[in-house]
């Protein structure tokens, strides 16, 4: 099992904990991680794009001029794609881009993502994250003490003061253990997680 330091909000090491290898020490499956990220991005797509083909554009039923003798190139309709106001070739239509990964694959992908952060020393454990008031400046100070900037902050419980304090920091996202996902883990440079959240993750995914 990997030993990692536990820091307080001042950035001082106060403890060490062992991480469960079945979650934080697995063999990294890059293909599954890739598929999990693709799934999240695909499921976000609206898929509402639409353009009209030549058969859907209004008008253009009459041949604009006779086939021969005008000196013009032959044309069958003013709604052909080469005409202004004509239809679109292979026009996009609404579609559903989403696809599914089974539960086992999702869990394996998340474990791989978490393991990669531990291996890269981008997994920071804090004993707790508590603020007396909603104060962005104070939260920035905590991050500075921990030597992190672009971070995913994983909380065990909904802490409104911490969440509100981090809301205006564009390089930080707060989440809870039940909302943890591969995309967020990889998007942010560092995962900052409370000691209680680590225990919950190990309880759920072990």
UniProtKB/Swiss-Prot annotation:
Disulfide bond annotation, renumbered to this chain: none
Location of region: Disordered: 44-87
Record's keyword annotation contains rRNA-binding: yes
InterPro entries the record matches: Ribosomal_uL4, Ribosomal_uL4-like, Ribosomal_uL4_dom_sf
Keywords: Ribonucleoprotein, Ribosomal protein, RNA-binding, rRNA-binding
Any one Gene Ontology cellular component term annotated for this protein: ribosome
GO biological process terms, semicolon-separated: translation
Superkingdom of origin: Bacteria
Basic residues bias: start-end ranges: 60-71
Any GO MF annotation of the entry: rRNA binding
Pfam families: Ribosomal_L4 (PF00573)
Family (UniProt): Belongs to the universal ribosomal protein uL4 family.
Function: One of the primary rRNA binding proteins, this protein initially binds near the 5'-end of the 23S rRNA. It is important during the early stages of 50S assembly. It makes multiple contacts with different domains of the 23S rRNA in the assembled 50S subunit and ribosome.
Subunit structure: Part of the 50S ribosomal subunit.
HAMAP family named among the record's database cross-references: Ribosomal_uL4_B
Name of protein: Large ribosomal subunit protein uL4
Organism, scientific name: Agathobacter rectalis (strain ATCC 33656 / DSM 3377 / JCM 17463 / KCTC 5835 / VPI 0990) (Eubacterium rectale)
């Amino acid at each position: 099992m990997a030993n990692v330091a536990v820091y307080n909000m001042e950035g001082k090491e106060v403890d060490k904990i062992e991480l469960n290898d079945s979650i934080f020490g697995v063999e990294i499956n890059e293909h599954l991680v890739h598929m999990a990220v693709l799934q999240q991005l695909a499921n976000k797509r609206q898929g509402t794009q639409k353009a009209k083909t030549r058969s859907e554009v209004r008008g253009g039923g009459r041949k604009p001029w006779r086939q021969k003798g005008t000196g013009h190139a032959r044309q069958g309709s003013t709604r052909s794609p080469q005409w202004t106001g004509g239809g679109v070739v292979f026009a996009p239509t609404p579609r559903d881009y989403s696809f599914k990964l089974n539960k086992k694959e999702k869990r394996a992908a998340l474990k791989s993502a978490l393991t990669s952060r531990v291996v890269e020393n981008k997994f920071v454990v804090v004993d707790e994250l508590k603020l007396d008031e909603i104060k962005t400046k104070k939260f920035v100070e905590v991050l500075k003490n921990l030597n992190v900037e672009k971070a995913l902050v994983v909380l065990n419980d909904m802490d409104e003061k911490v969440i509100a304090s981090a809301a205006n920091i564009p390089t930080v996202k707060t989440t809870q253990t039940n909302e943890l996902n591969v995309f967020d883990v990889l998007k942010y440079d560092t995962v900052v997680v409370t000691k209680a959240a680590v225990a919950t993750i190990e309880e759920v995914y072990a």
